[in-house]
């Protein structure tokens, strides 16, 4: 399942994440499809005082961004998550509106909504180059020919960065092993 946490590394990312949760709910109604989204919350625990201090800073940041957050002591952690082995746990935070969704469901909802607004989606059509004319995107060159367009959505995952570099656009994505 895809995790949909609200708190990001910056206030801008947090706003985008919160917006996405609302967008997915709205698009489910619009498209009649399901994202499989469940807002069951997220708990992060700390096993050291230092980690708990870090979680408290994150909780403060969350509150400043209007993200609902609850700081948890051991007792409250056990209430929320009874199977937790809490002997070595100092505390934690709970974000009740964080969610999870089915990545395939989200993709299908976004694709249908885009098509309803007039977008065309070309699957199995690798883009070789983004074409620029008069400092604007004019199309894409693919292995099946040129497609004229005003807008391009780069949905190439970690390869978006390379594609962006070719047209002097910074896409701050980096592969990360996890």
Name these PLM-found stretches.
Residues 1-2, 18-19, 58-60, 85, ...:
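Short, glycine/charged-enriched secondary-structure capping and boundary segments
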Residues 1-6, 40-44, 158, 166-178:
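Central beta-strand plus flanking loop segment that forms part of the substrate or channel wall
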Residues 2-80:
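Dinucleotide-binding Rossmann-like beta1-alpha1 core, especially the glycine-rich loop
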Residues 35-38, 86-87, 144-146, 155, ...:
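Solvent-exposed alpha-helices and their adjacent loops that cap or buttress functional pockets
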Residues 54, 162-163:
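Phosphate- and divalent-cation-binding pockets in alpha/beta enzyme and binding domains
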């Amino acid at each position: 399942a895809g995790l949909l946490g609200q708190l990001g590394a910056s206030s801008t990312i947090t706003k985008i994440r919160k917006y996405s949760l609302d967008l997915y709910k709205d698009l489910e109604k619009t498209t009649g499809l399901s994202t499989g989204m469940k807002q069951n919350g997220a708990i992060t625990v700390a096993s050291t005082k230092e980690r708990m201090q870090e979680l408290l800073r994150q909780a403060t940041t969350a509150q400043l961004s209007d993200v609902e957050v609850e700081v948890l002591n051991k007792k409250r952690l056990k209430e929320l998550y009874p199977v937790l082995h809490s002997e070595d746990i100092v505390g934690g935070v709970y974000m009740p509106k964080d969610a999870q969704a089915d990545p395939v469901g989200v993709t299908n909802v976004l694709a249908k909504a885009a098509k309803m607004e007039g977008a065309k989606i070309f699957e199995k059509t690798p883009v070789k180059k983004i074409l620029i004319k008069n400092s604007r995107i004019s199309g894409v060159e693919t292995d099946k020919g040129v497609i004229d367009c005003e807008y391009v959505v780069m949905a190439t995952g970690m390869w978006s960065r390379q594609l962006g570099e070719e047209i002097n656009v910074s896409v701050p994505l980096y592969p990360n092993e996890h």
